Amino acid sequence: MVNLPKFTMRDLVESGVHFGHKASRWNPKMAPYIYGVYNDIHIINLQNTVVLLKNALKALYDVVLKRGRVLFIGTKVQASAIIADEAIRCGQYYVNNRWLGGMLTNWETISLSIKKLKEYEKLIENVDNQFTKKELLLFEKKRAKLDRSIGGICNMGGLPHVLFVIDTNKEHIAIKEANKLNIPVIAVLDTNSDPTGIDYPIPGNDDAVRSIDFFCKIVSDTILEAIRSDLAKSGINVDGIKDFSVEKRDDLLRTSNRDNKNNKNNNNTDNTDNAASIKEEDLIGGSNNEN
């Protein structure tokens, strides 16, 4: 039995998931997911969001249950810290600084950079090294630069089995690479997004911190549930474990407790300012899309 995280329509409303962009900025391909317009702001139909979010979480659960790798991608300022925190919390991988062209389609070259990053880490951590302070500072500078770009995937060990993306417009190169390699893509789609190439679309606000936090957290929780199910099948008692990181080594899962971080900013940004007075009951009726 699949035990997916529970959420309600109120959770979506309180997270500001229903707020789209100004009507003038919309992508017509998102019309099926739009409920209407309020104060020149497109409002997302949360009935669609509920159904599609459940579909996406079920697909994600199935991938992780088979010990597949999940890559979180979100490089915009308001998503960066959340993407890293939630990927780490569930033991998965992330890109939160800048997507380097070829990260998927040219994995062999990226693997060489990962190898170089690990070499720098060993050099710096080796207390018996014979390098001067100046040389060590140079190594640290190079290590830090690589870590910003590929630190979140340095232990991935191969291509991911599924992508979870915040802001498909900004991360369009990553999506194209995934499509080329037939890697499924789960993505939050705002009203200005292009749903083309997205296997599991989730209509929702991809700009506000609270909305991003909601989606990243529920994705992370789903991954943790799948890992718990996998561990339970192996006879491991996982009762009471809520947050733990998971590392994959030779198809075995090793778990360790990890402190949950609570340093996220809860302020909304961009497309939430003009529709704060909308009531929950206004969002769950039939579709009234704009043509």
Swiss-Prot record:
HAMAP family: Ribosomal_uS2_B (MF_00291_B). Belongs to the universal ribosomal protein uS2 family. GO terms for biological process: translation. The keyword Zinc does not apply. One of its GO terms (cellular component) is cytosolic small ribosomal subunit. Residues 254-291 are annotated as: Disordered. It comes from the Bacteria. InterPro entries: Ribosomal_uS2, Ribosomal_uS2_bac/mit/plastid, Ribosomal_uS2_CS, Ribosomal_uS2_flav_dom_sf. Keywords: Ribonucleoprotein, Ribosomal protein. Residues 263-277 have a biased composition (Low complexity). This is Small ribosomal subunit protein uS2. GO terms for molecular function: structural constituent of ribosome. Pfam families: Ribosomal_S2.
